[in-house]
Amino acid sequence: MTAKPLRTVLSLLFFALSGVLGTPEISCRNEYGEAVDWFIFYKLPKRTSKASEEAGLQYLYLDSTRQTWNKSLYLINSTRSALGRTLQHLYDTHNSTNDTAYLIYNDGVPGSVNYSRQYGHAKGLLVWNRTQGFWLIHSVPKFPPVHGYEYPTSGRRYGQTGICITFGYSQFEEIDFQLLVLQPNIYSCFIPSTFHWKLIYMPRMCANSSSLKIPVRYLAELHSAQGLNFVHFAKSSFYTDDIFTGWIAQKLKTHLLAQTWQKKKQELPSNCSLPYHVYNIKSIGVTSKSYFSSRQDHSKWCVSIKGSANRWTCIGDLNRSLHQALRGGGFICTKNHYIYQAFHKLYLRYGFCK
């Protein structure tokens, strides 16, 4: 038996045993169903007009056990994809006892034709219990559905990114405040009353409370279940500057290359007006023969420019545009070497300041 089939059999055996021995721990999962501390996906844009089962559904994958991007084993709309495996925790909560919480937010709700501009542009999902859980931050509109895994057909055309991080329970007290600042459009949630004495804001947001005072912005230090350090930048609609130029670059003390959706007549130009500059990425290369324009890419990430003393990578849910400077949203950043190298080698060209 080859390594890949053997690994698949072992992962299936693990889940079979978990049904007997107890519920598997809530964590990010790889394509074999194995728990990982974190993973990142980069869904590639649809680059052909021809009908194809795979077009717009392939993705690059990186996790805490790897050192570089890998082509996914499955398409992103498969329940065997890393997202499909991980989100099974969400769908299992519908059949569990009241010991698991979840919260889903997106300004584009699955099945709706409208977008909620009164809320933040934030997109994400949390599932957790009193031991640990995960936070998925992503750029995909109308995702995920509440009752079963599907990837939206509207998400095939453009590139998309997301990061899943496994956190111990204590970190959800920090995330609780970050969610308040983001002003998320929560379209499904369940938080058992046993969580309420530790979590102040998420239960009230889940109950659609209108009496919450929203801070302008907040920076939180977070630590994954296995100890990887992150910082999370959360801004509300009351912070009306470009989050990249006005805050992230200056706080991290690094020049940034930023990839966000470059929609015509809405993008902000590269900015060198402050001590630390932000340059718009113009094209991305997966291989020497496979590349695409940032206009085909709905992903949102930035990375320190080559030669920087501080080598940061950030992934989030806001574009560099005038409209989104007025929306809530955020970015989670890390100095992990392998994440930095993986993203830094993707950019092909960026725009200089005028």
Curated annotation (Swiss-Prot):
Q: What does this protein do?
A: Hydrolyzes DNA under acidic conditions. Does not require divalent cations for activity. Participates in the degradation of nuclear DNA during lens cell differentiation.
* Compartments it resides in: Lysosome
Assigned protein family? Belongs to the DNase II family.
Residues modified by glycosylation: 70, 77, 95, 98, 114, 129, 208, 271, 319
Keywords for the protein's UniProt record, in alphabetical order: Endonuclease, Glycoprotein, Hydrolase, Lysosome, Nuclease, Signal
Q: Which GO terms describe its molecular function?
A: deoxyribonuclease II activity; DNA endonuclease activity
**Entry protein name:** Deoxyribonuclease-2-beta
Q: What class of enzyme is it?
A: hydrolase
The UniProt catalytic activity note for this protein reads: Endonucleolytic cleavage to nucleoside 3'-phosphates and 3'-phosphooligonucleotide end-products
According to UniProt, the tissues expressing it are described as: Highly expressed in the eye lens. Detected in liver, but not in the other tissues tested.
Which InterPro entries does the record cross-reference, listed alphabetically? DNase_II
* Endpoints of the signal sequence: 1-22
Give a yes or no for keyword Ligase in this entry: no
Q: What are the GO cellular component annotations? A: cytoplasm; extracellular region; lysosome
Give the EC number(s) under which this enzyme is classified. Answer: 3.1.22.1
